């Protein structure tokens, strides 16, 4: 899952949102440096990632990107899932997505003193380029694919990922539809468990 999905699977809890979004930027024991609510978000993110990687729909979606991108295929699928979530009118109208994106940026701003250095350096671009909302558009996904390729070793072209998304759009959307209800149920249960710990 990518930024939008992790924010969505934080169930409106401010510290969970922050922890869920910064988790990939927090290594090892550094998670113990954060308040309990943010730590729970970090742990929830990692549990969601494990669930995502093992889900049959994700394995099916990754197969579409495997030949061109091998180990990075899961990262492309994470972005694709955010696209389908942003465009899922059963979850977000355009206005609801706008409000959700703005609310998420506001929570990150409010908790700015807890953002790890690398996330804090990236966050102004996320907000100014409106990543969370623009996942709704194919051009927004193309920007994300290009960013992924820029940051990755051994990759220099994202055009094949766009070709896969456009040519396999229906199959990939079916993977999303088979996956999202399951991950939402899993994340809700896990979030409740973490709240009780």
How would you describe each model-predicted region?
Residues 1-197:
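N-terminal leader/auxiliary helical segments
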């Amino acid at each position: 899952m990518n930024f939008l999905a992790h924010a969505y699977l934080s169930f409106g809890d401010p510290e969970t949102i922050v922890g869920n979004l910064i988790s990939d930027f927090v290594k090892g024991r550094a998670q113990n440096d954060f308040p309990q609510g943010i730590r729970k978000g970090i742990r929830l993110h990692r549990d969601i990632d494990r669930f995502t990687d093992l889900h049959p729909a994700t394995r099916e979606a990754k197969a579409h990107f495997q030949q061109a991108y091998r180990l990075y295929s899961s990262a492309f699928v994470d972005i694709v899932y955010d696209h389908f979530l942003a465009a899922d009118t059963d979850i977000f109208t355009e206005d609801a997505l706008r409000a959700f994106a703005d609310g998420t940026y506001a929570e990150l701003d409010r908790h700015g003193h807890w953002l790890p250095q690398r996330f804090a350096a990236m966050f102004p671009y996320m907000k100014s380029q409106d990543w969370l909302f623009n996942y709704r558009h194919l051009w927004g996904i193309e920007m994300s694919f290009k960013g992924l390729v820029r940051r990755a070793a051994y990759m220099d072209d994202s055009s094949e990922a766009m070709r896969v998304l456009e040519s396999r759009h229906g199959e990939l959307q079916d993977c999303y539809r088979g996956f999202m209800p399951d991950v939402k149920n899993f994340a809700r249960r896990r979030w409740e468990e973490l709240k009780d710990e």
